């Protein structure tokens, strides 16, 4: 084998190795990427069987604990749309109605989001940027009232869908 052919052979092997490494890296990233969805996003474009993060506010009056003591059902809203969620496990101490929440899981066939992890905001002034952006896209208006913040739909006089965030 001549020197020129050997160089081309080595270059070809190097490119093949680099291509394989790139393909494996992209495949690993694709499996581990979890997209963020608001309730409105889930209604418009359901993710199928893909694992996603659902963010919004826990709707007032929606939290229900089941008899087994571990399963909890609640609704997540961005004031425009609402998605029912079920979670089996211990919820964070800061989890409560009217608070921001991010749940990671999958949409079930019955239209209920099955969460495998639930994250609550960590203090009274923090809201995950994704949740804040989703509320703004949904047209929610934040109103400050002494001791609490209220998110309501911008185009509605109906306060039935109002979500109240109580500050401790």
From Swiss-Prot:
Its main location: membrane. Coiled coil: none annotated. The keyword Methyltransferase does not apply. Disulfide bonds: none annotated. Keywords: Cell inner membrane, Cell membrane, Cytochrome c-type biogenesis, Heme, Iron, Membrane, Metal-binding, Signal-anchor, Transmembrane, Transmembrane helix. InterPro entries: CcmE, CcmE-like_sf, NA-bd_OB-fold. It is a single-pass type II membrane protein. Residues 29-168 are periplasmic. GO terms for biological process: cytochrome complex assembly. GO terms for cellular component: plasma membrane. One of its GO terms (molecular function) is metal ion binding. Residues 149-168 are annotated as: Disordered. Belongs to the CcmE/CycJ family. HAMAP family: CcmE. Heme chaperone required for the biogenesis of c-type cytochromes. Transiently binds heme delivered by CcmC and transfers the heme to apo-cytochromes in a process facilitated by CcmF and CcmH. This is Cytochrome c-type biogenesis protein CcmE. It comes from Rhodospirillum centenum (strain ATCC 51521 / SW). The lineage of its organism: Bacteria, Pseudomonadati, Pseudomonadota, Alphaproteobacteria, Rhodospirillales.
